[in-house]
């Protein structure tokens, strides 16, 4: 069985379905630090303006006082990649695929199933805090490595931010898809292409119930197709021709 890892997103949209917010034990230490930060501290940590930091501070305070509601993560996150993932009107098989084979890597919650209930928050591995004297990446590394040992065949749709959270020896069987546009024989890639394509790729995997590495090579989605000459055992390249 294939396991997919996807990143979080800064952009969020409140879905209809909500739950009580139950915070994992490993996240409690992070919440304690974030909830104690002033607006000025948060602005520096996030590198945002103080006005925006006020909103984030309120979210942390609400979580600390157990006032937050939680929402299925894949529905709450609404960044460009998430908007290109099929999230509504799923078949029973697609719903099972999404909730059992897709996991989200978070610097606040750890690695969680795609439908895990989470609260509104802003947090990533660039957030400048120390937990028990450790960086966020060091703090989460044992948890992330344990997940990798339990799920050796991972399809990673993660950005470079996560490269050194996992130890290298945990990623020997990992495959990272790469998405490129071809125009007049020239290949290019950029953030927008990649984010849209990640969502479309995951949707195609769900719809086709891909369970083997070889099945990924026959996928055609949003104009992309597998390019064997540019691909390696650990990097599958998908090309889309532009007019």
UniProtKB/Swiss-Prot annotation:
<dbReference type="Pfam" id="PF03883">
    <property type="entry name" value="H2O2_YaaD"/>
</dbReference>
<comment type="similarity">
    <text>Belongs to the UPF0246 family.</text>
</comment>
<dbReference type="InterPro" id="IPR005583">
    <property type="entry name" value="YaaA"/>
</dbReference>
<dbReference type="GO" id="GO:0005829">
    <property type="term" value="C:cytosol"/>
</dbReference>
<protein>
    <recommendedName>
        <fullName>UPF0246 protein Spy49_1742</fullName>
    </recommendedName>
</protein>
<dbReference type="GO" id="GO:0033194">
    <property type="term" value="P:response to hydroperoxide"/>
</dbReference>
